[in-house]
Regions:
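Glycine-rich, low-complexity segments
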Residues: 1-4, 24-51, 75-77, 81-83, ...
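A short beta-strand element within beta-rich, extracytoplasmic domains
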Residues: 64-76
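Short beta-strands within extracellular/lumenal beta-sheet-rich domains
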Residues: 47-61
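Exposed aromatic-hydrophobic patches
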Residues: 110-119
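Short, charged beta-turn/beta-strand-edge "cap" motif at the junction between a beta-strand
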Residues: 19-21, 134-137
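Extracellular/surface-exposed low-complexity repeats and stalk/linker segments enriched in Gly/Pro
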Residues: 1-18, 29
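Noncatalytic modules at the cell exterior or secretory-pathway interfaces
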Residues: 119-134
Length: 150
């Protein structure tokens, strides 16, 4: 018998052995069993303030806390610490975005740090947007892969 938590929070992940479930707000749903959902972005040139990139979800997808397993790099080290802020819009209100996390490139490197308050999840038609909220004069050619599950 599996003893699920009595008062789960939205998108909470519960694991027993090698199986995991995610609380969708109403029920526990098998997590990670539906296959991968990979999003890739390639933003050429210097990472300038207010550059925008986005993806509209063709299927429901969930991502680990802090976009665990996701990767990013560039072709030139950052002088400062550029920041990309990620936001979500629901399919029903595609122009209304709420921030869900950030990616910061450490100064002097091309190494990212992803931060989210909770594991992000999306339904079909939702949008994830990346907005450069702190640009950098030398970091260039951002390539980014967000790794989630269906």
């Amino acid at each position: 018998m599996i003893d699920f938590p009595a008062s789960p929070t939205l998108n909470q992940i519960f694991t027993v052995g090698t199986a995991s479930w995610r609380w969708d707000g109403a029920k526990w749903v098998a997590y990670g069993s539906g296959g991968s959902y990979i999003i890739a972005f390639d933003i050429p040139g210097v990472l300038t303030l207010n550059a925008v990139f986005a993806h509209v979800f063709a299927a429901a997808a969930a991502f680990p806390l802090h976009f665990g397993g996701s990767q990013a790099r560039g072709s030139a080290n950052a002088t400062g610490s550029p920041v990309v802020t990620f936001a979500r819009s629901a399919a029903a209100s595609p122009l209304s975005f709420s921030n869900i996390g950030t990616m910061t490139i450490t100064a002097g490197t091309t190494n990212p740090t992803f931060i989210t308050a909770s594991p992000p999840s999306f339904v079909t038609g939702d949008t994830i947007r990346g907005l450069v909220t702190t640009g950098d004069v030398s970091f260039a050619d951002l390539y980014l892969t967000l790794a989630g599950t269906r």
